[in-house]
Amino acid sequence: MSDAVSIDVRVRADAPIPLDVALAAGPRDVAAVFGPSGAGKTTLLRTIAGLHRQATGRIVCRGVTWLDTDRGVCLPPHERRLGFVAQDYGLFPHLDALHHVAIALGHLPRDQRRAEAARLLALVHLESSASRRPASLSGGEQQRLAIARAIARNPHVLLLDEPFAAVDRATRRALQDELDALRHRLDMPIVLVTHDFEDVIRLASHVTLLERGHVVAAGAVGEITSRVDLPWLAAAAGRGSVFTASVDRVDERRKLADLRFDGGTLIVPAGSLTSGRYVRVRVPAREIILATSRPEGLSLHNILEGRVSGLESDERSGVVIVQIAVGETHLLAEVTGDAVDRLAIAIGRPILALIKSVAIEVG
């Protein structure tokens, strides 16, 4: 893709963590890199930024080659048009918010910097904090300031290293929503490193699973979360299918909402959902009950018709992971081996997936 960040990097043996990673992202994409501590996630970002110089391979951003060891090309960090938000945000204690952003606007005439800095602060909802220093800002406000400074350089890619690690869960949710809204206004890809799979579920279009510097799996989030052959991901984040749905209808009287996706309609608690929105949906594998005939007299709303498209036994837990094709979407269900035998579950067999409304996660 011409407007993409494309990465093909190998880190030499003297690097802290050897890497063998390929990654691509287009404008407004969020490419997540997920893995445990020590997987090489930060080393990968530092390699993209030119801060880790023991790399071989190729990095191209919007047609500009940043790294190509075969041709002897390795641009220094200041020549790579990128924004980098580190885990500690890297803020200066003596500067207020406005000056943090203004010093990153050296490419603009001096008389334009203040107004542009104010505009960027407003973009991240910090317009009323322009005169405040980092010590007086909350963790979430510090993160917003770091992002405003990072995008002030008008970068071609934004690199985020565990951007939500220093905030509580409620603040994390709010910042995720803000970043999701912001990415639609930025004509650039975002590479997001995280050890919390909720960040992937709520923000990412694609994910690369990284372990000890090597790619375990990579692809669209919906594709990766619906695979039956990734016990590593199940152990790290729990099994559950992720897909996008539209809020088709909200019933104010019953306090329920209809979510439409290519496999049908799901009924969920309405909460703050509004009609016409697109939302990310996660269905935990443990919350799906399988049936071969339509049951009666149940309280649950959601019965989806599908077909068994995959089976995998988890030797460690003793459960069987069943992949169900519902339209173009694939769900995962965890059942016992006994259930597989009793229901004669086999690839290609029609199956019903029963899901409680309150078990469906909507973000």
Predicted segments with their positions:
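Glycine/charge-rich catalytic "coupling/switch" loops of P-loop NTPases
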Residues: 265-312, 329-330, 334-363
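Conserved ABC ATPase signature
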Residues: 133-137, 141
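A short, proline-enriched helix->beta-strand linker immediately N-terminal to the Walker B motif
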Residues: 152-156
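Internal alpha/beta loop-helix hairpins
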Residues: 184, 194-264
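Conserved ABC ATPase "signature" region
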Residues: 64-69, 112-129, 180-181
